[in-house]
Amino acid sequence: MRKLNVRWLGNLPYSEALILQKGLKESVSKEYNPYDYLLLLEHNNVITIGRTGDSNNLLLNSNELKEKGIEFFETDRGGDVTFHGKGQLIGYPIIRLQDPKKVIPFVRSLEETLSLIHI
């Protein structure tokens, strides 16, 4: 049985959180590692855009984002444009699923669970 290691990281720049996630993803993929992870943290203002994202969905251009102190990152995750801001709780689950094709149902189930407990 896999164990869930939950870590509260406080305020962490997106770039640092991304490096940590990539390292943990590599670790979780190892057969001998019994741990999955849930990283809980917050970022300063940042916008990310996923592989299927459309930059036309951004309301500000790169100069305007920079003027407002909002970082911008293109990521290899799915999805479109996402904003994270100071004070917003963010959870990054890094979990080895038995069936990698079931990522979307897993995410939907996680979202539903969090909404039931009003998070």
Write out the residue ranges for each language-model feature.
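N-terminal lobe of the biotin/lipoate ligase/transferase fold
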Residues: 1-115
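Conserved small/polar residues in nucleotide/adenosyl-binding loops
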Residues: 117-119
